[in-house]
């Protein structure tokens, strides 16, 4: 049973997928956001191709724990995914994941232009690994 993670950005969506044993997260793709309908259609195909049974969505709240406009957008996307695709969506606190992703990409000596494109995918990996690690503690 695979888990898919989504890091919803302003222009791009980062995607990461777990291995079938739900131990390791790996980066999958970065999609340009071209509207909700396009996103859900592409996501539905991805869910079928990878036999995803659970989706984790980065939950953007401020460092002080307050919700904002992006939080509302992410909630809306979660509701859309659940209603159209029929897979439960769980939220994972994504505070500082973009900064952590940027650091990983810098350490990997990735060029600035490519870093900008890859940071959402790397953030999705961090979100998913955080979720997988916390799930393994529950069992």
Swiss-Prot record:
GO molecular function, one term: nuclease activity
Signal peptide as annotated in the record: none
GO BP of this protein: rRNA 5'-end processing
GO cellular component terms, A-Z: cytosol
Enzyme class: hydrolase
Pfam family, one: RuvX
InterPro entries found in the cross-reference section: RNaseH-like_sf, YqgF, YqgF/RNaseH-like_dom, YqgF/RNaseH-like_dom_sf
EC number: 3.1.-.-
Keywords: Cytoplasm, Hydrolase, Nuclease, Ribosome biogenesis
CDD domains attached to this UniProt entry: YqgF (cd16964)
Subcellular location: Cytoplasm
Superkingdom of source: Bacteria
Keyword rRNA-binding annotated: no
Similarity-based family: Belongs to the YqgF nuclease family.
Function (record text): Could be a nuclease involved in processing of the 5'-end of pre-16S rRNA.
Identification of the protein by name: Putative pre-16S rRNA nuclease
Source organism: Dictyoglomus thermophilum (strain ATCC 35947 / DSM 3960 / H-6-12)
